[in-house]
Amino acid sequence: MFPPSYDAFQGVTAIGWACANMAHHFGISLVMTQPITYLLQLQQLAKQGQTRFGCWLRGDAQWQHHLLKTLVPHFAEQPILMLGQTELEGVTCVDYRQGQQWLGRECQLLIVDLTQGWDANSFNAVLGTLVGGGLLLVVGEPTTLNHCARVWLERACHRLLVITPQTVPALPNSDSVTRTNTEQTYTEQRLAIDSIIKVVTGHRKRPLVLTADRGRGKTSALGLAAAELMSSRSMHIVVTAPTLAAVEPLFVHAQRTLPQAHRQRGEVQTAQSSLRFMAPDELLRTQPESDLLLVDEAAALPLPFLKRWVERYHRAVFSSTIHGYEGCGRGFSLKFQSWLQVQRPQMRSLHLEQPIRWAAGDALEQWQNQVFLLQSELPEVALEQAREPLSFSLFSQPECVEQPERLAQVFALLVNAHYQTSPNDLFALLQDEAMTLFVAYQGEVCVGCVLAVREGELDAPTIEAIQLGTRRPKGHLTPVTLANQLGISQAARQSCWRILRIAVHPDCQRQGIGSQLLTHFIAQHHADYYATSFGVSEDLLPFWLANHFVPIKLGSHRDQASGCYSLLMVRGEHLDWLEQAKQQFSAHWIFELSDSLQALEPQIIQQLLPSTVALPQPLIPLELIERYARGGANYESVAVWLYAWLLATAPSLESLSPLLISKILQRKSWAACAEQFQLSGKRQVEQAVRTEILALLVNLQCKYTLPI
């Protein structure tokens, strides 16, 4: 950084002299006026270029407080936010963990107190509220973090402009700060708004894919376009995203444009139109009528969801952050857009590059991208690298801190593979000593990684408290679940490694790298057993089954963001309690199929059935079942025997048809089955059921010579 030219700062120099004169008049020490003068000059420079600057105020608490107290009145007409519950007159203070509640708002001065604690998600959310011409002031030291996480954050803060009671840095070079054309800033956003409106006014089946980096006004454009449509016609618009908080700016901008509208949480209504949020799982389940579907942060949602919505809604916009934790770089383009171009050849796409809230080349945005690895891209895997042998190794926390380029590669894999990776995950990886990171390399390219956490080895009083429901120790999901929900205390006493994430480079998948990673990880990380918990899908489950993990607990509710049921699986040898866990799992999940798991996909049920332990069954009248299959009896008279028979034979069946799963095991209505399998009504559904039962009977007779 170099000091600015004299001409560029005649204005800010005048401010400096004014502050010095004021200090002399009121008896304020020059030790204080030097930082104040500097910060006011810095703000003028920021305003000149609509950019943002960050400063780290390093000094004792009394100096910091006095400096802020003196500075705040200069920002009296502008919104000021402080992250950290320190009382400061004229400043809105929020808990350091609650920055997300400021999504959709703006501030000109953002103060962050590190002594209160550190939450990376909260910090990243609130940093987006700081507009061009604004300043970030970091105060205090990150004393609540352990060594590696603290070193990472301190190094990040040292890359800001560091101010002490004795010294201030040179002002940034004015040549790097150029004035922004406000009209040009909004040109791209206007184009985005018009493109969204065109989805409604143009031909059907021409979805729009809208992509952007953070801060480009993508979500705001969705809200502004929705408001224009609602004001010009009767419109019912549905919005979905991983969380309601992610689309809060959409509703804020829609209401600002529609001052007469009534707004409540996740909804804006006018006399003739509505804009409402629906969680992804609810939207998938209920499939409401809608004139326009807006899917924000689409890259963070499961691909099967997006495909279903494309088929169901013929006027839809899919928007996504390409860099940052909300998106997944080119993975979104590879997975979804390529599929969409085949299914909807008339689709359109638009990428926003111009920032809205700050100027291009913003200093603070570049800093944020570096610190939180927001622009980490998956590296290309060259053909010659793909031929190199795999090497496996531990990537320790100190190595992560000292080798940020390698860490960025690994983290790009994690972000690409998992829809819920967040800034806090980066700091958990650096902070939590129970976590470990295990990586696979081909040459210089990281092609796979395992992130795992050590669990278990709990003492008897803790286990008893867990089983009574009075304690739930953080970071012990598997032993807590086994002790509390399955009543297996022995598992909580034993040691466990739980796999939090496993990721393989998209160019290297289907080559067995994931299985090799697991094998090498288990060989180098001893424990009594290993576990994993994930949103179960027909794509993921076969991988874990093939690697000798067995299911022991299936959640009863879908995750709102992923839309999947959570499945806990374990792997271990000579575990006295494993057979008991398998029997409990079999009884529980089969029982829940007709209740809380009625919406579980038949394909997943097919994959789980072979893991089901055969339970003692009553005498089954096969003759009655055969007569029904051939057209006799009625369904109600044999339903109980069909259910018992399928459960008794399921472990030996290679594949049970989705129709029999839905009607007999999940006990769905005739109407629901007709809709699901596109049949005309009960008669056609029942005929299909009879046909499939007869085929199953014949198949089993051939295999086991059953007397039917």
Curated annotation (Swiss-Prot):
Catalyzed reactions per annotation: cytidine(34) in elongator tRNA(Met) + acetyl-CoA + ATP + H2O = N(4)-acetylcytidine(34) in elongator tRNA(Met) + ADP + phosphate + CoA + H(+)
- Please indicate if the UniProt record lists Signal as a keyword: no
Indicate which residues the UniProt annotation says bind ATP: 189, 215-224, 357
Task: Please tell me whether the keyword Transferase is annotated for this protein.
Answer: yes
Q: Which GO cellular component terms, listed alphabetically, does the Swiss-Prot or TrEMBL entry include?
A: cytoplasm
Q: Which Pfam families match?
A: GNAT_acetyltr_2, NAT10_TcmA_helicase, TmcA_N
Q: Which residues bind acetyl-CoA?
A: 502-504, 509-515
Under Enzyme Commission nomenclature, its number is 2.3.1.193
Locations listed in the record: Cytoplasm
Which PANTHER family does this one have? Answer: N-ACETYLTRANSFERASE 10, RNA CYTIDINE ACETYLTRANSFERASE
Q: What does this protein do?
A: Catalyzes the formation of N(4)-acetylcytidine (ac(4)C) at the wobble position of tRNA(Met), by using acetyl-CoA as an acetyl donor and ATP (or GTP).
What's this protein's name? tRNA(Met) cytidine acetyltransferase TmcA
Q: Which organism is it from?
A: Vibrio cholerae serotype O1 (strain ATCC 39315 / El Tor Inaba N16961)
